[in-house]
């Protein structure tokens, strides 16, 4: 374990609002606003800005400018010092604040134009024309103390020293040195990074090259003229021998069914090259294949803030590890493993980074924290438009005197709906975003102080979370990703057609994904770990690690508490009489005080699963009064409010049940019985109903039961018992019908069963007729009575 060291800044990019300065300059130009000397967005050179305070001399820029110009002209020595109307007034914070601001009414007042006139520093004893001509020679700002430029004594086009080599007396070492020097110069002139090629010298346009090209062109033209002067010989002037040779030549070139290999002239064939020739019209063909080829469009197309900090030993650890592993520079990957985690303003999303810090981190990792920020420029513009419209409506509805008072107040204070105020809002959000990224980096740097890792945060300006994660993933190419969820049931689809983010990442990204439920991490230990009383004063919450022993004790206590049956509180009785008496007393008490459906559901769950369902960690967190809980609007939450709130999730993501409590009819239940057990209605199959309640015979799922609200407990219990007897009798009747159908299908029925089945059919027909007759009357009673 390496000692904790301070992380160092690596590389940071800020592209969250790149067009802020240009937009503000365009607004000032189009609206003809006054450009003050201390404009917040435009940089005025210090030689023209009297607000600029020179750090070297400790005086203002206007005094320095007047002093330098007084040395050039003897006229200025007799002149009085310029009128200091533009001296800055220091505020309570010590920051110079020039009173000719953009929002000040004096900036737009024509009667006070002298405040922004460039002649405030001009002396009365000299000509304004001469002074303005002298001002064209500007003075540069003071140079830095340490120059970043390398000093070189030779000129830019001056050649370096050349070693003289006597080629008359060459030995092996000298020849080898000359060969290396020639190759190095050729590679430098070719423009290639690795190796060299002569293709870069094909487009030279020197004098000797032009002369040589012209001579080659003249030679080719003369050859073409000579060949054109030669005319082909006619057949009339040929001899018989020439005609015979010409005939043989045509026969060898033509197509014939009777070709002879001895008559084929191989010397007249077009040469065939086996290597592939590149097309000259191919646009991808470059002069130097080893030269650097840059993409025609940018790789990073999203606006974001990217900050990175490294452990001081990170680079050395990576290089040493790669040397041990014999890694080849195929992909030019600097990091050994890149892990990405997504966080947002929702608290449960931070469980992904917390789980990585506690369980997955190792030396050489590159942790990339991805977060998003919406398109705040458009939202600020919409907000400014609404404020401007509201002020306009208030001005129209108010009286004349009130409108004059409002107009006078608007001149004194800045207009929040103006474009300049909008730019200040955008810059404030930008600065707050940078500060938030810095705080997140410092927080996890303190938690990972003992690990040699690199931490990066990428805040993408995007309204869509999916697009932001896609852009950041294509940029960093992580080896694995950790995502958190509030529910373990991630394969669900919402009413608006969207799916959960973990399911989207697991389905569409070709990389390992760790899905961390928020309830599996105890929030109390992550917020503030337990420490001893002696160490409480000298310990820090961020540096204190959660002890493994405390975690195991908490899990053991949870398992022990959930395995105890809280519903068996009566004592075990030895004799049968006492047991029967206790059962009768329990049943009598249950008749007067029936068990609630929630309690009965808990008892059935314990009989089925064998343990008590534990509370979710969110509920435990809300039940703890020592912690402060707030909602999105900043209001403090209580356990009752959090359970009744619309945004709170009432489902338990830890346990999934198959018990849905649906209604089932007889047609859905008949398949459970087999023909062997149909004759014994009270005996259940050993495969299905060994451990179930005898009252529930049709399905393994509990039936929904309705109870009249107007009855007393004793009446309701009596009616329920009579209902059970009727249901029991009806159950015997249906079993008898099923046995009748079975005997009819096997053709082994008797007359007694046939008579019972016929009577049953008649009884069912009468009931259906009676139901049809009473249907209209029941509807009439429901509507009118």
Curated annotation (Swiss-Prot):
Transmembrane segments: none annotated. Residues 776-785 have a biased composition (Low complexity). Keywords: Phosphoprotein. Residues 66-79, 575-584 have a biased composition (Acidic residues). The modification Phosphoserine is found at residues 215, 667. The lineage of its organism: Eukaryota, Fungi, Dikarya, Ascomycota, Saccharomycotina. Residues 725-739 have a biased composition (Basic residues). This is Uncharacterized protein YGR237C. The keyword Cell cycle does not apply. Present with 1050 molecules/cell in log phase SD medium. GO terms for cellular component: cytoplasm. Residues 53-65, 81-94 have a biased composition (Polar residues). Residues 53-162, 571-590, 631-657, 693-785 are annotated as: Disordered.
């Amino acid at each position: 374990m390496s000692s904790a060291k301070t992380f160092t800044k690596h590389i940071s990019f800020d592209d969250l609002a790149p067009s802020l300065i240009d937009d503000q300059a365009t607004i000032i130009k189009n609206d003809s606003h006054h450009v003050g000397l201390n404009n917040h967005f435009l940089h005025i050179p210090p030689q023209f800005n009297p607000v600029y305070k020179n750090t070297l001399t400790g005086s203002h820029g206007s005094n320095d400018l007047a002093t330098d110009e007084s040395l050039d002209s003897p006229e200025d020595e007799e002149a009085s010092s310029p009128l200091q109307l533009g001296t800055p007034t220091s505020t309570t914070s010590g920051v110079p604040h020039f009173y000719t601001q953009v929002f000040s009414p004096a900036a737009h007042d024509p009667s006070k134009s002298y405040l922004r006139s460039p002649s405030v520093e001009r002396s009365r004893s000299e000509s304004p024309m001469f002074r303005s001509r002298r001002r064209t020679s500007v003075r540069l700002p003071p140079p830095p103390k340490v120059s970043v430029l390398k000093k070189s004594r030779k000129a830019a086009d001056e050649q370096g020293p050349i070693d003289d080599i006597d080629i008359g007396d060459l030995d092996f070492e000298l020849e080898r040195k000359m060969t290396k020097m020639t190759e190095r110069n050729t590679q430098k002139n070719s423009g290639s990074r690795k190796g060299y090629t002569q293709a870069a010298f094909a487009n030279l346009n020197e004098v000797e090259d032009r002369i040589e090209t012209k001579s080659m062109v003249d030679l080719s033209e003369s050859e073409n003229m000579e060949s054109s002067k030669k005319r082909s010989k006619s057949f009339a002037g040929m001899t018989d021998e020439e005609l015979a040779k010409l005939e043989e030549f045509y026969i060898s070139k033509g197509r014939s069914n009777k070709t002879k290999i001895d008559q084929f002239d191989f010397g007249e064939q077009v040469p065939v090259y086996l290597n592939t020739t590149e097309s000259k019209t191919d646009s991808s063909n470059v002069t130097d294949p080893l030269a650097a080829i840059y993409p025609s469009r940018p790789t990073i197309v999203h606006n974001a803030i990217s900050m990175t900090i490294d452990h001081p030993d990170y680079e050395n650890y990576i290089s040493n590890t790669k040397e041990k592993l014999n890694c080849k520079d195929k992909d030019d990957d600097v990091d050994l493993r890149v892990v990405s985690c997504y966080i947002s303003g929702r608290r449960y999303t931070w469980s992904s980074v917390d789980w990585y810090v506690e369980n997955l981190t190792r030396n050489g990792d590159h942790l990339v924290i991805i977060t998003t920020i919406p398109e705040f420029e458009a939202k600020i513009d919409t907000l400014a438009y609404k404020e401007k419209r509201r002020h306009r409506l208030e001005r129209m509805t108010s009286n004349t005197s009130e409108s004059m008072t409002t107009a006078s107040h608007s001149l004194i204070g800045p207009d929040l709906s103006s474009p300049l105020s909008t730019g200040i809002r955008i810059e404030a959000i930008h600065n707050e975003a940078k500060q938030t990224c810095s705080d997140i980096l410092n927080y996890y740097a303190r938690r990972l102080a003992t690990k040699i890792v690199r931490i990066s945060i990428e805040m993408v300006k995007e309204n869509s979370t999916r697009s932001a994660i896609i852009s950041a993933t294509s940029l960093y190419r992580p080896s694995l990703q950790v995502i958190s969820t509030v529910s373990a049931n991630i394969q669900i689809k919402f009413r608006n057609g969207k799916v959960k983010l973990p399911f989207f990442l697991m389905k569409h990204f070709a990389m390992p994904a760790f899905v961390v439920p928020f309830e599996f991490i105890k929030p109390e230990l992550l917020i503030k770990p337990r420490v001893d009383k002696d160490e409480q004063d000298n310990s820090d919450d961020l540096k204190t690690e959660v002890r493994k022993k405390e975690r195991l004790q908490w899990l053991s206590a949870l398992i022990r508490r959930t395995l105890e049956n809280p519903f068996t509180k009566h004592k075990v009785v030895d004799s049968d009489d006492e047991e029967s008496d206790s059962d009768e007393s329990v049943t009598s008490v249950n008749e007067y005080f029936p068990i609630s459906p929630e309690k009965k559901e808990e008892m059935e769950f314990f009989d089925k699963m064998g343990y008590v369902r534990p509370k979710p960690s969110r509920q435990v967190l809300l039940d703890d009064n020592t912690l402060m809980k707030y909602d999105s609007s900043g209001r403090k939450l209580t356990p009752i409010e959090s359970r009744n709130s619309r945004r709170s999730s009432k489902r338990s993501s830890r346990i999934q049940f198959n018990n849905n409590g649906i209604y089932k009819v007889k047609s859905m239940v008949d398949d459970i019985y087999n023909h062997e057990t149909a004759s014994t209605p009270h005996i259940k199959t050993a495969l299905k109903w060994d451990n179930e309640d005898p009252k529930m015979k049709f399905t393994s799922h509990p039936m929904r039961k309705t109870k009249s609200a107007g009855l007393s407990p004793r009446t309701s219990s009596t009616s329920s018992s009579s209902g059970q007897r009727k249901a029991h009798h009806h159950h015997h009747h249906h079993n008898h019908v099923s046995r009748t159908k079975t005997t009819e299908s096997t053709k082994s029925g008797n007359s007694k069963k046939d008579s019972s089945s016929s009577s049953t059919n008649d009884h069912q027909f009468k009931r259906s007729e009676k139901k049809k007759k009473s249907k209209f009357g029941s509807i009439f009673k429901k509507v009118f009575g």
